[in-house]
């Protein structure tokens, strides 16, 4: 239904087994009635996503930690997000960027809460264990090898200014990721290539099947616990995983690539 400034209402009706029908109404009474109907629908609706500010990140993380349903965990990231790096590495990055000790402690607290929920997903005792899947963008990971530093989206959004990551720190994150892959049997890492013709948006996305989804891009953070959205995202990400060639998701091949990339960064 389209309504033009109290003047006209264009309504389309589609019933199974029949041709779609469109009706243009100019009668002011009918148009006002349609406007009231739409306003009522909006008032009774709720947003699919809730945008939140970086200062509300702790509350959001504590909220998602209250969800305890079993389900696969998907993380689609252009490259590893340093928001969830190990504590020692995160402290090193923040210190080298001149962040105050007070702010460092705040970010370490966020990191601990987020990693605790991730750790719960990695170590679920369900039988069989639900998969924990990282999908990274291959070319983006390779591009970050070329410069001396690059900007961490997640940390920069939280701090409000650019936070830079060095080659050495990037290499350490890749080694930590390879280590996690060897320690968790239900963890999988796969690389999406630009040549795969898989339509995925340029966002960071963490999605816990049947529970919640968090998205992050340059505009900020968004949270959803709408089951329809989460189910759709889970299906898209799982379909993406199935389309990736075996060589880019085989655990041994992936671990070898991560360690080789780390070694290249440290030369």
Predicted features, each with a name:
Residues 1-246:
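Hydrophobic protein-protein interaction segments
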Residues 235-267:
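Charge-biased C-terminal accessory regions appended to nucleic-acid-, cytoskeletal NTPase
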């Amino acid at each position: 239904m389209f309504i033009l400034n109290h003047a006209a209402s264009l309504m389309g009706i589609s019933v199974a087994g029949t041709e779609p029908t469109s009706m243009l109404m100019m009668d002011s009474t009918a148009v006002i009635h349609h406007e009231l109907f739409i306003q009522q629908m909006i008032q009774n609706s709720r947003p699919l996503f809730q945008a939140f500010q970086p200062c509300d990140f702790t509350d959001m993380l504590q909220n998602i930690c209250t969800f305890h349903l079993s389900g696969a965990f998907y993380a689609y990231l252009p490259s590893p997000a340093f928001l969830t790096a190990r504590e020692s590495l995160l402290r090193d990055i923040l210190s080298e960027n001149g962040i105050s000790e007070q702010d460092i402690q705040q970010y370490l607290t966020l990191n601990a809460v987020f990693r605790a929920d991730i750790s719960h997903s990695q170590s679920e005792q369900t039988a069989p264990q639900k998969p924990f899947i990282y999908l990274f963008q291959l070319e983006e990971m390779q591009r970050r090898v070329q410069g001396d530093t690059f900007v961490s989206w997640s940390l920069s959004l939280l701090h409000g200014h650019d936070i830079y990551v060095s080659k050495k720190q990037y290499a350490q994150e890749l080694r930590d990721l390879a280590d996690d892959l060897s320690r968790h049997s239900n963890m999988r890492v796969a690389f999406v290539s630009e040549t795969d013709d898989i339509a995925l948006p340029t966002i960071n996305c963490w999605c816990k099947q049947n529970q919640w989804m968090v998205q992050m891009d340059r505009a900020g953070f968004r949270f959803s616990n709408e089951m329809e959205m989460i189910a759709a995202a889970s299906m898209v990400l799982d379909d993406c995983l199935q389309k990736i060639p075996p060589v880019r998701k085989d655990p041994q091949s992936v671990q070898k690539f991560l360690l080789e990339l780390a070694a290249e960064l440290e030369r």
